[in-house]
């Protein structure tokens, strides 16, 4: 049985697209539920019109300016929460949106869409600005899983749609049957 431990802050404090691709196959642990990350999107800096920090630093976007390895949770359409992980060097606003996961515990369930995964896991605005490194209840770990993924344009946005910054697993059949993970 593998013991799941949080990834180090250095994992998140890198180029956002590198972090987004390397999060594919990593394990998200949240309050007793374990899921494999299957889809991510990058939002990078003030030159990315789809990034919340494109217009500068605000109370809402302050967390995006670092340090890396913290959660950025916000509400969209007045009803859906979205989970992001802050990336890059402190002072540079960037984050990876977690768009999809495959839950492996307590049940086997594929969740496509950031709102669906937050609803199922119970993630809400109270989980904004959580340290993912020094936290036993909410973190990302690595069980050595490498999954094939494709790169596409980001979806669900109206600006910055030309960026190929969405990463999605190409085959989820029999995804996790050989892994036994214990947080």
UniProtKB/Swiss-Prot annotation:
Signal peptide: none annotated. One of its GO terms (molecular function) is alkylbase DNA N-glycosylase activity. Pfam families: Pur_DNA_glyco. It is an enzyme of class 3 (hydrolase). Keywords: DNA damage, DNA repair, Hydrolase. Gene3D superfamilies: Methylpurine-DNA glycosylase (MPG). GO terms for biological process: base-excision repair. PANTHER family: DNA-3-METHYLADENINE GLYCOSYLASE. Belongs to the DNA glycosylase MPG family. NCBIfam families: 3mg (TIGR00567), PRK00802.1-4 (NF002004). This is Putative 3-methyladenine DNA glycosylase.
């Amino acid at each position: 049985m593998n013991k799941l431990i949080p990834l180090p802050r250095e994992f998140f404090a890198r180029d956002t697209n590198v972090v987004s691709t390397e999060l594919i196959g990593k394990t998200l642990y949240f309050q007793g539920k374990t899921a494999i990350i299957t889809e991510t999107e990058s939002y990078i800096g003030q030159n990315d019109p789809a990034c919340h920090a494109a217009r500068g630093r605000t109370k809402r976007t302050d967390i995006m300016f670092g340090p890396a390895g913290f959660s950025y949770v916000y509400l969209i359409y007045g009803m859906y929460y979205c989970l992001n992980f802050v990336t890059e060097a402190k002072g540079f606003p960037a984050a990876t949106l977690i768009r999809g996961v495959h839950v492996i515990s307590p049940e086997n369930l594929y969740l496509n869409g950031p709102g669906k995964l937050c609803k199922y896991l119970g993630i809400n605005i109270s989980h904004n600005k959580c340290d993912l490194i020094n936290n036993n209840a909410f973190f990302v770990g690595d069980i050595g899983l490498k999954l094939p993924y494709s790169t596409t344009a980001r979806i669900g946005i109206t600006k910055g749609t030309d960026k190929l910054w969405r990463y999605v697993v190409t085959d989820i059949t029999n995804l996790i049957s050989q892994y036994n993970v214990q947080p």
